């Protein structure tokens, strides 16, 4: 037991987690936390990913129905990183879960917005791949064993996309994943007309698919294009925070301005702008979600934006 051989008061705070996962309390970590929550008070951070729509949930009315969304970069334009510069960087992982073991079709699509969002390249997982990945790459720095070096993909992006699927042994649910690392090709896609999108097609009426991004560099958006949908912030909750018998903790706003030991007052909002952090309200970045079992998380919120602390005796002024 986490509280030891002799039962004693025990509180454990976990300020960590990931937005990837089934979000249904059935994973090994979720089951472990639920069991230990019987013996200790376990507090888990909700997460700080709610600024963007990093989840997408769809219940299909019929078999063969499709939902489409754009994989939109969180930071558009140039992004210098070390010796490289990326353009409209899309980097991270996406996981899509069926509500049960029923399969669905999953595709990452290179979309040509100049041609009415016509598919230029499809990178599909049409049936269970049992974890075997299919990778498309631009070649050059992104050449890798087993990858399909696709010239149209390379015209759009420098980078790669890998897709795979399997039945999750922990949850019993069928799921598909994509790993993405793309930067717009500055010779043939400098205007950004080639974009990445996600397509999912159902196999049964009433089938539900829950899609989660890792909230690093990509979110789900319709880009104001017909036939595409935006994602939702509802579902940005950390997968670890979905366990039973725990206390899931979000953030609320305490102050939006604060004095510093340098004599100046700092704040989140600039003069003339709207108040993004109104005192007493849940912080916009604080993750949340409504789970399939009906629970709304987090359960409570604690001061998080911003936390005001006393000055400790070891504080010294930086001479620079």
Regions found by a protein language model. Give the residues of each.
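Loop-rich non-cytosolic ectodomains and luminal regions
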Residues: 1-320
